Amino acid sequence: MLQPPNILTIAGSDSGGGAGIQADLKTMTAMGAFGMSVITALTAQNGLGVTGIHAPGPEFAALQLRTVLDGFPVHGAKTGMLFNAGIIHALADILDAETFPLVVDPVCVSTSGHQLMEDDGIAALRDRLFPRADLLTPNRPEAEAFTGVAIKTDDDAIEAGTRLLDMGVKAVLMKGGHVEGKPVFVTDWLLEKGHEPVALRQPHVDTQNSHGTGCTLSAAIATQLGFGLPLRIAVTKAQEFLNLALRHSYAPGKGFGPVNHMAGLKK
């Protein structure tokens, strides 16, 4: 049997288990990879929201990353919640020397509206990690925050994605999940330097149990890149994984439930 790829998540911990590193590791495992983690923040949260955040110092975040890299080859990685500029700079100093595929999910605000990044982290993320990113996966509010473009149409999404490419990222997946009403399809736009934008559509799933969707998608893409797939195919497979997880999502407790990462493993 071929050995599975080693995939790394650099993100915050969700005590409720639906998002963050918990969602990432479930995704990697369900896809047949070996998941590893660098924890950038501890969050106290559940399906109702975030009640507190505790972040380790930048030195300990960097120590986790160096220790993982010293012990394991990494075939793909993603970043999620990074919380502040100090952590971002400490991690970027190490990541700049690495060549594995890196998916950057620019997490700024939780689904419940809680700020997950301090104000100084926005510029640090843009300046230090965007140039290292093989793919950036912003949702609409995140893309608007980084570009200043009010996204209401597909043309707006493409304009915002183009501006993000100009900031140094190699490719951008403009996620279309933040839409009003009940559309038949959700359209994500994949933009790569030197290529025309590509519309990637998936059936819309009408559910309130969507906690951890962004984390799951970026982890799934990083995993597929770790298997050696080309970017567009990796994104498509990740979308399919997330869509299935959404269709089988449920609420194990109060509030918004998580997607079901194990849906594809059921018999």
Where are the model-predicted features located?
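Acidic-glycine-rich active-site phosphate/pyrophosphate-binding loop
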Residues: M1-P4, T9, G20, V184-L200
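Conserved N-terminal subdomain of the carbohydrate kinase-like
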Residues: L2-T9, I21, L25-L116
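Phosphate-handling active-site elements
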Residues: M31-M36, E196-P197, Q224-A238
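Charged C-terminal helix
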Residues: P4, A55, G71, R232-K267
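Glycine-rich beta-alpha junction loops
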Residues: L42-T43, F83, C108-S110, E142, ...
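Short pre-catalytic strand/loop immediately N-terminal to key active-site residues, enriched for Gly-Thr
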Residues: I10-G16, P197-H211
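Short, small-residue alpha-helix embedded
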Residues: T27, E144-A145, T207-L231
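Conserved phosphate/ATP/ADP-binding segment of small-molecule kinases
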Residues: D119-P197
